[in-house]
Amino acid sequence: EFVALVERLIGLPWPIRLDQFDSTAQQLGWSPTGDTGIFTGNFASGEQRIMCTKDKSKNVRVISIPFFRPEREGFEEFGLVNDAFVAYVAAGFEVWGKPFQIVIDRYSHVAWKYPQNVIVELTRYERFVDLSFYTPQGIRVY
């Protein structure tokens, strides 16, 4: 699921204006919430809110998805978050090779850069795993 979503995002015809992103989001299986740049989608741990930010030209810059978030919050769930992070990193490593950035600390993260001039960053927080997709318009802020 993680790799398939990233591949679909990479293949989109960037730049895309945020105010024109609704139809693209719906093709990805996401639903508009009525708030510009906020969508909902179903992932491994259920329905999550997706946030898209824009640049000065109103093009989508970064798509942020809490890709894995357990329903409950406890010690056991912390382990699930870590396991999910490790599994997603392993899947990415298998398909795209070694990330260009690996940080192991309280909020560990890895990042891959692609020839299409996009960056995918996967971050493990205490309660969830976040997927941040930097479009060619957003890569400048990375």
What are the functions of these language-model segments?
Residues 1-107, 114-119, 123-142:
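Short helix/turn-capping signatures at newly exposed starts of structured segments
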